[in-house]
Amino acid sequence: MKLIWSEESWDDYLYWQETDKRIVKKINEIIKDTRRTPFEGKGKPEPLKHNLSGFWSRRITEEHRLVYAVTDDSLLIAACRYHY
């Protein structure tokens, strides 16, 4: 499964690399798990509603979520900082 980062999500990821390596490790673990099983597993996967319909979120920390969408052959990371 191909991994695609939105501009915002890549900026989020770079922010975590500079400020908190533990969160980067957690994000990497969640992405690895999501590539294997997109709709179940670590981080309590949850389908989003309304204007984010089609996207899913997984908990990174109490405050931050990984927001993503899955297509046939790719995983689009939309955000990995703050809530949706």
Curated annotation (Swiss-Prot):
Report, from the record, the phenotype seen after gene disruption: Deletion of the tomB-hha operon causes reduced infection of the mouse bladder but not of the kidney.
Signal peptide coordinates: none
Could you say which enzyme class this protein belongs to?
hydrolase
The catalytic site is made up of 46, 83
Quaternary organization: Forms a complex with antitoxin YefM, in which the toxin is inactive.
Q: PANTHER family annotated for this entry?
A: TOXIN YOEB
Can you say what this protein is called? Toxin YoeB
Q: From which lineage does this chain's organism come?
A: Bacteria, Pseudomonadati, Pseudomonadota, Gammaproteobacteria, Enterobacterales
| Originating gene | yoeB
